[in-house]
């Protein structure tokens, strides 16, 4: 059963998630036992990369660090984080720009493109804003990348009632949750496969983000996936 779960999730689950998945199936084993069995079965999950840097100095307005490493949220669409990461696929660079909700670590919007340009980032913001109820006014935190300093980006946030927040210069820990997602994405998806084309990479990436949102359980979310956790929270009486 442990081996089946490990291979079903393509080696992405370590012993902690295997314990949670077994629990959902009615099989209660402790962490030590699962860890020992995985070692005996030679089942080992995979490990972490280098980041794309979009900082080009102060070319626009720098926003305050409103998030201030407060990475927990009490409801959906309260606090979002974003960044851009780079992939080299078949000799071509591809750039992913996602928004992650700190409430349940769900990717609420993303854009994938051959170049890191402002249009991609604006489309991502608009995609996320379409999810908002009239009363919702999220905080959106980023690093000091050039895209986030541009007047057009900052005006778009204002138009949707989104408060801008920025990390301090050169301090990646101020956006640690987004950095962790990129590390996870590259370990569980990008480094595990050889892509024969950019199209194959794009399709695989879309599939992984769907898997991450809907199927990949998290200990922090009571053993649920991000979407399951959000759905359950909306059903709970207020």
Q: Where are the predicted features?
A:
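Basic, flexible linker segments flanking DNA-binding modules
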Residues: 1-75, 171, 225-234
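Mobile genetic element proteins and their domesticated derivatives, centered on retroelements
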Residues: 2, 18, 34, 38, ...
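Residue-level detection of the helix-turn-helix DNA-binding "recognition helix"
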Residues: 23, 39, 43, 155, ...
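RNase H-like two-metal-ion nuclease catalytic core shared by retroviral integrases
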Residues: 56-58, 142-144, 150-151, 157, ...
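An active-site-proximal beta-strand-loop segment
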Residues: 69, 73-108, 114-116
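Short small-residue beta-strand/loop micro-motif enriched in glycine and branched aliphatics
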Residues: 104-110, 164-167, 191-192
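Active-site beta-loop-alpha junctions of metal-dependent nucleic acid enzymes
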Residues: 111-134
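C-terminal domain-tail junction helix/linker
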Residues: 158-162, 184-238
């Amino acid at each position: 059963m442990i081996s089946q779960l490990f291979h079903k999730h393509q080696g992405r689950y370590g012993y902690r998630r295997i314990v949670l998945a077994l629990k959902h199936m009615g099989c209660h084993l402790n962490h030590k036992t699962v860890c020992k069995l995985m070692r005996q079965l030679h089942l080992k999950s995979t490990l972490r990369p280098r980041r794309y840097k979009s900082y080009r100095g102060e070319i626009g307005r720098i926003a305050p660090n409103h998030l201030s490493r407060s990475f927990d949220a009490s409801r959906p669409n309260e606090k979002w984080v974003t960044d851009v990461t780079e992939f080299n696929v078949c000799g071509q660079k591809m750039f992913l720009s996602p928004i992650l909700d700190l409430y349940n670590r769900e990717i609420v919007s993303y854009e994938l493109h051959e170049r890191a340009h402002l249009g991609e980032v604006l489309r991502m913001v608009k995609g996320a804003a379409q999810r908002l109820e009239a009363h919702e006014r999220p905080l959106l935190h980023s690093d000091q990348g050039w895209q986030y300093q541009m007047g057009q980006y900052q005006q778009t946030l204002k138009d949707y009632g989104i408060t801008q927040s920025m990390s301090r210069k050169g301090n990646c820990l101020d956006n640690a949750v987004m950095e962790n997602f990129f590390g996870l994405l590259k370990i569980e998806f990008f480094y595990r496969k050889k892509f024969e084309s950019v199209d194959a990479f794009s399709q695989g990436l879309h599939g992984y983000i769907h898997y991450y949102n809907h199927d990949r359980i998290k200990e922090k979310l009571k053993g649920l996936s991000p979407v399951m956790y959000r759905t359950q929270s909306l059903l709970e009486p207020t």
